[in-house]
Amino acid sequence: MCRKLYDKLYEITGAKLDFNDKNQAFILLEEQIPVCITDNDEYIFLTGLLNEHELFTENIINPEHILILNYSLSRDYGSSICLLPDTHQCVLTKKHYKKYLSPDELIESLYEFLFCIKLTIANITSEVN
């Protein structure tokens, strides 16, 4: 685990990360958007909840729309929309390799990830409504 990355996060945001036995810590960005930070030996993996509903299994949204949106997010921000296998929840993910990531870049990346989550939620919400 890369302590200096998380110390900087705490310094900037006041968010202290408590990692569980799966090397996962949970944080609320802007006090409303849940994000899981998974710390692997080589990388940090971000997972943000987009929708609590089963968008695909309940036929709420056209999968083609999600695939097109996923392409744009991947191309422009390096993020991907995924479906969690156990819960069928729609999430946004992004992987950062530690050897290329400074503490300041982690903070910047979290802000960009938050922007992508908001952008994706707005897009999905407009498509559903």
Swiss-Prot record:
Subcellular location(s) per record: Cytoplasm
Main location per the UniProt record: cytoplasm
Leader sequence segment: none
Keyword Ion transport: no
Keywords, ordered alphabetically: Chaperone, Cytoplasm, Plasmid, Virulence
GO cellular component entries: cytoplasm
Superkingdom of source: Bacteria
Function, as annotated: Molecular chaperone required for IcsB stabilization and secretion.
More about this protein: The icsB gene can be read-through into the ipgA gene to create a translational fusion protein. The biological significance of this process is unclear.
Assembly mode: Interacts with IcsB.
Protein name (Swiss-Prot/TrEMBL): Chaperone protein IpgA
Organism annotation: Shigella flexneri
Species lineage: Bacteria, Pseudomonadati, Pseudomonadota, Gammaproteobacteria, Enterobacterales
